[in-house]
């Protein structure tokens, strides 16, 4: 084995134990090392590093309040993030005393090897700015490989739906087991002797389509005592308030948590040992199922009732975060916790975060999924899509929802009451040709706009002809949906200020500052840059609650 001497006075002074970041190899060999890390710890058929080791690399081992995060052997808070316009969202790096550096982006798979000797000839060299320039150029070039102009050539067809659904093509499919599937495979042994309250809806079903209600009702050694339903009811088909009822098949009472009560009462929870929660979030802050779960955690804590969350995928992947943190003044049912609009967590991870950050003294268990990776979009999991709510009918709509859902409180229809909610917007006073031209001129990555006319059957402008735009997703990886919503709102305000009335928006954006910036006519690109500190703060906070590592193969 070749051994080298680290050129690091600090390491030498302390006997070599700290500061040993020297890179004794060639760029080619270090490239192999980087590809091994990005490949989930494997090199060819060989498993070089375990998933536990990789997870330790991505987990903070330094105090989160000290402003500088490190995992096992890596910086998790590279300073280049703050100084680069086209930044990576999930970089790690390690540098050496002589100026060497490895830099990897877990999200995109980009890595950079920089070998130098800044100490030659007088020991006073400084390569920090050079390294920053190299990383900036490399990231910018990688980000620009698929430009909006190139993407638009794929969209020259009237078959919008087929193109829209092709964004996940050629993606490898995993065989993910939900928390319910895992619990079922264990024959519900964790629930032995328990009296169960089940908070679920139509999405609570196994891979083969058996409902959670039927599985718990038929399980040995436990008693399904009562049911709870979130917004839209136990079958997920209601768009208004839902009254409590009785399940026709099992005879159990269904306590609605979107009717007279938003929080479970002590009477509803009487006689229950454990509340099991099996709900599908959509990856967006104002989707209310996470709030219903949080209210259940709070109620269970007061009554010393245990809670078990059966985890399910974040449909729009568990890596991306985007948007401003929720202002404290907007905390409520559509915003339980100060987080960006696109949060990048699963329901189980959200439960852990809510419990810890809000000091909810509940005994909480999360049944993890098997096979799910943070990079996975829902169509890469092998799980069947079940509409989690009436107007969330496919993955494209879920992808657009963080942006289009954030502005639906304004005087526009977002397609509710049509076959393509959140894929189109319009109003009787919009000129679709004008709006499409204005939005396409923005050159937003991953999306194109086409003039469209539609008549909603229900919801806003029901029965009236609306003109607007159809939103065609051409690259879901490049798309930033919250930025998209911001651009749409700013463009509508500029073109139709009297009709749009943005000042009356109910602020699902969650930020008074952003609303003021749009009304003042500020550039949306500049507004989005102001979110970076919020996004960084959220990434740092959420790290301690991640149940699924970034370092993992797709399958």
Where on the chain are the PLM-derived regions?
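Glycine-rich oxoanion-binding loops at beta->alpha junctions
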Residues: 240-271, 284
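Conserved anion/nucleotide-ligand pocket segment
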Residues: 331-401
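Conserved functional hotspot residues or short segments at active or partner-binding sites
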Residues: 426-530
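Glycine-rich, charge-decorated loop segments at or immediately adjacent to ligand/cofactor-binding or catalytic sites
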Residues: 235-241, 308-330
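Catalytic loop of the DD-peptidase/beta-lactamase superfamily, centered on the K-T-G motif
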Residues: 1-171
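Glycine/threonine-rich flexible loop motifs
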Residues: 281-293
């Amino acid at each position: 084995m070749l051994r080298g001497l680290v050129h690091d006075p600090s390491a030498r002074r302390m006997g070599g134990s700290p500061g040993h970041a020297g890179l004794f190899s060639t760029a080619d060999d270090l490239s192999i090392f980087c590809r091994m890390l990005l490949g989930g710890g494997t090199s060819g058929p060989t498993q070089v590093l375990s998933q536990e080791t990789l997870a330790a690399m991505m987990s903070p081992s330094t105090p989160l309040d000290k402003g500088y995060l490190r995992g096992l052997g890596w910086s998790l808070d590279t300073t280049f993030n703050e100084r680069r316009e086209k930044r990576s969202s999930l970089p790690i790096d390690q540098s050496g005393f002589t100026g060497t550096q490895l830099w990897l982006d877990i999200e995109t798979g980009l890595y950079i090897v920089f070998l130098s000797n800044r100490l030659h000839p007088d020991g006073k060299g400084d390569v920090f700015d050079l390294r920053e320039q190299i990383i900036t150029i490399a990231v910018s070039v990688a980000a620009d490989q698929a430009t909006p102009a190139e993407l638009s050539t794929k969209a020259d067809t009237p078959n919008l739906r087929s193109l829209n659904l092709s964004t996940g093509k050629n993606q490898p499919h995993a065989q993910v087991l939900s928390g319910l599937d895992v619990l079922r495979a264990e024959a519900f042994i964790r629930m032995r002797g328990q009296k169960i309250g089940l908070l679920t809806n139509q999405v609570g079903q196994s891979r083969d389509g058996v409902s959670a209600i039927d599985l718990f009702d038929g399980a040995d050694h436990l008693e399904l005592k009562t049911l709870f339903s979130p917004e839209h009811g136990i079958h997920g088909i209601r768009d208004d308030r839902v009254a409590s009822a009785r399940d026709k098949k099992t005879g159990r009472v269904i306590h609605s948590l979107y009717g007279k009560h938003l929080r479970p009462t002590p009477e509803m929870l009487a006689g229950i040992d454990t509340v099991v929660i099996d709900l599908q979030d959509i990856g967006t802050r104002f989707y209310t199922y996470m709030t219903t779960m949080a209210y259940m955690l709070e109620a269970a804590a007061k009554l010393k009732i245990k809670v078990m969350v059966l985890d399910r995928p974040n449909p729009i992947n568990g890596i991306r975060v985007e948007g401003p943190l929720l202002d404290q003044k907007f905390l409520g049912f559509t915003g339980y916790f100060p987080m960006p609009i696109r949060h990048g967590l699963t329901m189980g991870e959200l439960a852990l975060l809510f419990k810890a950050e809000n000091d909810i003294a509940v005994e909480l268990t999360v049944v993890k999924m098997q096979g799910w990776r943070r990079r996975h979009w829902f169509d890469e999991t092998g799980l069947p899509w079940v509409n989690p709510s009436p107007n969330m009918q496919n993955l494209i709509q879920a992808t657009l929802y963080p942006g289009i859902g954030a502005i639906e409180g304004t005087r526009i229809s977002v397609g509710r009451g049509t076959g393509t909610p959140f894929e189109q917007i319009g109003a009787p006073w919009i000129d679709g040709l004008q709006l499409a031209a204005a939005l396409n001129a923005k050159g937003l990555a991953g999306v194109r706009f086409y003039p469209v006319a539609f008549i909603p059957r229900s919801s806003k402008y029901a029965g009236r002809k609306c003109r607007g735009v159809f939103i065609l997703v051409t690259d879901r990886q490049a798309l930033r949906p919250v930025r998209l919503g911001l651009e749409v709102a700013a463009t509508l305000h500029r073109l139709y200020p009297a009709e749009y009335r943005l000042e009356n928006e109910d602020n699902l954006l969650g930020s008074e500052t952003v609303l003021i910036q749009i009304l003042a006519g500020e550039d949306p690109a500049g507004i989005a840059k102001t979110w970076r500190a919020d996004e960084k703060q959220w990434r740092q906070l959420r790290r301690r609650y991640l149940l699924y590592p970034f370092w993992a193969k797709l399958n």
